[in-house]
């Protein structure tokens, strides 16, 4: 899979995109990441990419001409096509389902907004999708782009073990079960005995119940989504009912 990132600050990406899983994925040829400095498409000697907003107001706005030229040049590269995604606080909220969807694509073009945003006409003409990583404001879209690349890349086949993906938090709307490693006792705290039993069936059942318990305690809103998606078994529902879950989400009764 190919990631193209259009940004005013390409140096911000050098550390996060060249370490750990992303580094190994690139070395293995599973993904490629290409950084593009939007200033390279500015036409004046000062490489101007922003200007004051029409109508007045605080801050600056990213100009249409250099940004549009950058997007079109990247789209014209001799590679498979891909959607243009703008990272912006007013986009749809990014989640694991969107990450899975994007991971099926051969290419993704990410545009990092900055200042007060980009000229609206570029959004109307060239942007296919808008994504936000949360209900807060960052200095620019660079950090959001890093989050999207990391979340999507790990779902590309061959990047990480498929079993690890299945058991991760949010893979089926449930949070992940607790993890333990050696030593068996640390500062008086012992690893649950079931994990030392070698009984794989019992361990699997314990892990499932812990996923349900943790989700109920920390993110009960996810349980209604899990039930609606059909990922909760009768045994799951019985256990949740025993713990007091009544099928309600944050917005009311589960539909």
Swiss-Prot record:
Enzyme class: transferase
Pfam families on file: tRNA_m1G_MT (PF01746)
Localization per record: Cytoplasm
SUPFAM superfamilies, per database record: alpha/beta knot
Cellular component annotations (GO), alphabetically ordered: cytosol
Keyword Methyltransferase: yes
GO annotation, biological process: tRNA N1-guanine methylation
Entry keywords, A to Z: Cytoplasm, Methyltransferase, S-adenosyl-L-methionine, Transferase, tRNA processing
EC code: 2.1.1.228
Main location: cytoplasm
Catalytic activity as recorded in UniProt: guanosine(37) in tRNA + S-adenosyl-L-methionine = N(1)-methylguanosine(37) in tRNA + S-adenosyl-L-homocysteine + H(+)
Binding locations of S-adenosyl-L-methionine: 113, 133-138
GO molecular function: tRNA (guanine(37)-N1)-methyltransferase activity
Entry similarity comment: Belongs to the RNA methyltransferase TrmD family.
Known role: Specifically methylates guanosine-37 in various tRNAs.
HAMAP family xref list: TrmD
Quaternary data: Homodimer.
Protein name: tRNA (guanine-N(1)-)-methyltransferase
Source organism: Chloroflexus aggregans (strain MD-66 / DSM 9485)
Upper taxonomic lineage: Bacteria, Bacillati, Chloroflexota, Chloroflexia, Chloroflexales
């Amino acid at each position: 899979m190919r990631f193209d990132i259009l940004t005013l600050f390409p140096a911000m990406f050098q550390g996060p995109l060249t370490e750990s899983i992303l580094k190994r994925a690139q070395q293995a040829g599973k993904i490629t990441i290409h950084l593009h400095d939007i200033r390279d498409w500015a036409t004046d000697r000062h490489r101007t990419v922003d200007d004051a907003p029409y109508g007045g107001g605080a801050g600056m706005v990213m100009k249409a001409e250099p940004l549009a030229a950058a997007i079109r040049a990247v789209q014209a590269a001799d590679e498979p096509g891909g959607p243009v995604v703008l990272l912006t606080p007013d986009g749809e909220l990014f989640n694991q389902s969107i990450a899975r969807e994007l991971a099926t694509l051969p290419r993704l073009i990410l545009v990092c907004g900055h200042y007060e945003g980009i000229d609206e006409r570029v959004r109307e003409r060239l942007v296919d999708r808008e994504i936000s990583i949360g209900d807060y404001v960052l200095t620019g879209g660079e950090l959001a782009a890093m989050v999207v690349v990391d979340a999507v890349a790990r779902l590309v086949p061959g990047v990480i073990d498929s079993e690890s993906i299945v058991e991760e938090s949010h893979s089926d709307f449930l949070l992940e079960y607790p993890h333990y490693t050696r030593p068996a006792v640390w500062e008086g705290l012992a690893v649950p005995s079931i994990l030392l039993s070698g009984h794989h069936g019992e361990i699997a059942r314990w892990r499932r119940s812990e996923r349900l318990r943790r989700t109920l305690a920390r993110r009960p809103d996810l349980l209604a989504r899990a039930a609606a998606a059909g990922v909760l078994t009768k045994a799951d529902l019985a256990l949740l009912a025993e713990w007091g879950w009544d099928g309600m989400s944050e917005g009311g009764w589960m539909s």
